């Protein structure tokens, strides 16, 4: 084995005290195996049985916390009615002694399936855009508070289902749209006035989840967050060569990361970043992912997950 890969096989201790035997992770992948009510099926169970010994952490594909958050017809939904089916998933994921993580999200503005079935797709603002192909309904403050509670209830269900942790998906969908300069046009405490107000929903959801975890989960329960470091919107009326309109910048994300690191989280997951437009904004074209993740690592090194 090449020496540079040796560290991947070494144990690592998370901030919550849990030691993982290696540093391999199965990243979240949506396999579209759920039934039409969001319940896992044997397709999901068998998928995880085949991969149960591949990594120390196994993370499910995106799992909705609301019927109004479904982005596809066979997406996982962590609802009361699906709890027993999720217990089969965790049993399969943990069958070789590794840790099972559920990635939780709300589809928000991208919840096309919810729009088709229930008549509404929700976002921070009503927006005249050619990206979606269907109208957005602006969330009221009361609805936002309900969504925060739904994340908390889904956290309870994740604990009861036997998951060892949760990854909060802040990289796209509802939370991303509130953090976005493009999608968020609100003028209230959840609005676009400042980075603090654009970050408010992410932090409120995280705080609700932490409250439940502290009250109900084992001390070594894992809590991670997934970010999209930087993003630009390219609509049909834009040329990709112009770089698109800013959704959020790396500096924006670093601000939100630091706010989240004031809370008891165990890791930060940086996904592939931006779209075609993001690459046009680089001062130096090259190994883009290494440049961006390297910057993020400098900000978090020793504070969350000592990679």
Question: PLM features: what roles do these ranges have?
Answer:
Residues 1-307:
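Flavin-dependent oxidoreductase catalytic cores
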